């Protein structure tokens, strides 16, 4: 498919020099024509402003679900199961707050992509110095590698549980998902979205079955959604809580969302873009609502199946698999758990591969053939995962899954702060710039992320046991 160039967007007249908000030559460069990320899919899905409300919703349905995949990946499973089995329903409030933060940040990401015709990576490359841009690219690649590590390991664990395959063989098999991405995207971006939505539906069905047989204490679960100060005081609880935050609010999803909303062929007028922003936010909020249900279901399952039965140390995914059927008295419970894990891993690796392509093209402006781009981004995940299993052994998989989510949490400020800075900039966004209330909420979210990260660092360096665990896992993952 020939590459398309985004239409000229209606923006304020170009102004040269540095802007008042510190963006280097932002207004001077925002009208410069650049090739879009994912050029083979750019503006390929029709969107008519004259269609009915339902047809508009359907036209924009899809990007939000690709984003939601990252909020229910195998990294979430490790943190949610560990949190549920050890602390019961207490950490449900963290799941809720994390998902609300994710909904807010993804709305800003979608607005950036639609209003400017740039994804977040392209905006960073244009408006920061080359050195800063390269730093942000490296940080983002680390985040993607950590996320992909969790996804690849999750898929490998599922294959082992279902078919008895060694973990290393499972990791190598996951490399084949590159072919799935190529085959689906070759038929159109709608096929990618349909594939992802189908897998999400299968995950939700599996957990609906598990929850039905787990018989949760619904009153205690409802109370669990109320935040408690105990979470900040308890070292282990805070460690898992920040892992949940890192597993829920994914840095690379902010880059992904700002790009894939541009697969819709909305008009270039201010009115058309405003309408597109509205439907894009509706799509992502609804999709992340499903992600909230699945994340909460995993933690509730851990609490109902294990914590209430005195099993407080079920942190390994494999242990959860072995215990589910006998504990719940349902023969299919363990099998469905593994099937959902496999679906989650495949879904996440697919979107992670797309995010890797977007980040590479956006930050470095490197245009490679689709198969080569995806082979490179897949290798970034496959190689570390193979090294981890080869040198660390299979018994450290879940601890590394949790650690990967904590690493993701540390990467968040480097994606969130540029996103807020850009969407606050009237010279870049025009009348789409954040309102005063949105700006206050955005910086509050950023401050909360920084606070939790600083608190975790303090706890890690104050506690030798946690420090040794983290350093040991890092050394193992490095081989």
In which residue ranges do the predicted regions lie?
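Transmembrane alpha-helical segments of multi-pass small-molecule transport proteins
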Residues: 137-141, 162-184, 202, 206, ...
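Extracellular/periplasmic helix-exit of transmembrane alpha-helices
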Residues: 102-115, 261-269, 289-319
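Hydrophobic alpha-helical segments and their helix-loop junctions in multi-pass secondary transporters
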Residues: 178, 200-229, 238-241, 245-259, ...
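Extracellular loop-to-transmembrane helix junctions
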Residues: 55, 82-107, 121-125, 132, ...
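Juxtamembrane transmembrane-helix boundary signature
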Residues: 67, 94-127, 136-142, 347
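Flexible loop linkers connecting adjacent transmembrane helices
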Residues: 39-45, 79-84, 107-132, 157, ...
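Loop-to-transmembrane helix boundary motifs in multi-pass membrane proteins
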Residues: 130-133, 168-171, 286, 334, ...
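C-terminal membrane-solvent junction of multi-pass transporters and transport-like membrane proteins
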Residues: 195, 368-379, 400-449, 453-457, ...
